[in-house]
């Protein structure tokens, strides 16, 4: 009886997990459709989308803050030199908001030249809003002393730069004001290619539930078979007296 109850509870949990993944599948489809629409639509003023900020194409006007650059380490397969950094600079808008902007990628050998990229000339830029990155336990901590960042944690960046940063950053889509050839532009195409694996996850949970039923039935047959053999042996022993 105890085994049957355990199997039943486990089966219910597995089935519920399967339906939960189907619900997540629906939510992810709606999210991806909304994100695709946002990314392909014309850029709109940031002030008009204060809710649900991530993954919107926006335009902002203001200027970069010099001497505040962050070098975010990242490999780039399309470049002949794989190792390099994303140039991330705080941008102060005309509304006095300060937003980190990922402006482009440069190779490791150009690290000393890239300091020429930032000036405080007023201009308008277009970019896609992105959520703050989370520190991963398997990644080393950011090397603040040498300005080598592995994670763009906006709370940490606020403390290091001494700025009150917004809780999102931008990937710049418009041509950077620096016009430096060594600063390669960034692409947002990968954002529309986010995988939606929740259907596979649902099949996995439902499959485990079905497997549990099969295993339990095999187990019951095995127990019943052993019980029949035992009773048969007892009868034979009694008949021998």
Curated annotation (Swiss-Prot):
It is found in: Cell membrane. One of its GO terms (cellular component) is plasma membrane. Keywords: Cell membrane, Membrane, Transmembrane, Transmembrane helix. Coiled coil: none annotated. Pfam families: SURF1 (PF02104). The keyword Cell membrane applies. Belongs to the SURF1 family. This is SURF1-like protein. It comes from Rickettsia bellii (strain RML369-C). The lineage of its organism: Bacteria, Pseudomonadati, Pseudomonadota, Alphaproteobacteria, Rickettsiales.
């Amino acid at each position: 009886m105890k085994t049957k109850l355990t199997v039943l509870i486990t089966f219910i949990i597995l089935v519920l997990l399967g339906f939960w993944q189907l619900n997540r599948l629906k939510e992810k489809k709606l999210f991806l459709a909304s994100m695709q629409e946002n990314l392909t639509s014309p850029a709109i003023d940031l002030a008009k989308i204060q809710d649900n900020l991530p993954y919107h194409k926006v335009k902002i006007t203001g200027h970069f803050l010099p001497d505040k650059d962050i070098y975010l380490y990242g490999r780039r397969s399309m470049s002949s030199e794989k190792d390099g950094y994303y140039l991330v600079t705080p941008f102060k808008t005309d509304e006095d908001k300060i937003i980190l902007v990922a402006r482009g990628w440069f190779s490791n050998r150009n690290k000393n030249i890239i300091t020429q990229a930032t000036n405080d000339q007023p201009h308008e830029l277009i970019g896609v809003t992105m959520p703050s990155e989370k520190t991963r336990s398997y990644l080393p901590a950011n090397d603040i002393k040498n300005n080598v960042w592995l994670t763009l944690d906006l709370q940490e960046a606020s403390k290091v730069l001494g700025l009150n940063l917004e809780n999102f950053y931008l990937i710049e889509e418009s041509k950077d004001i620096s016009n430096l050839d060594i600063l390669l532009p960034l692409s947002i195409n990968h954002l529309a290619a986010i995988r939606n694996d929740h259907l596979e996850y649902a099949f996995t949970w439902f499959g485990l539930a079905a497997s549990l039923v099969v295993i339990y039935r095999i187990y019951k047959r095995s127990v019943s078979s052993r019980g029949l053999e035992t009773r048969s042996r007892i009868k034979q022993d009694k008949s021998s007296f």
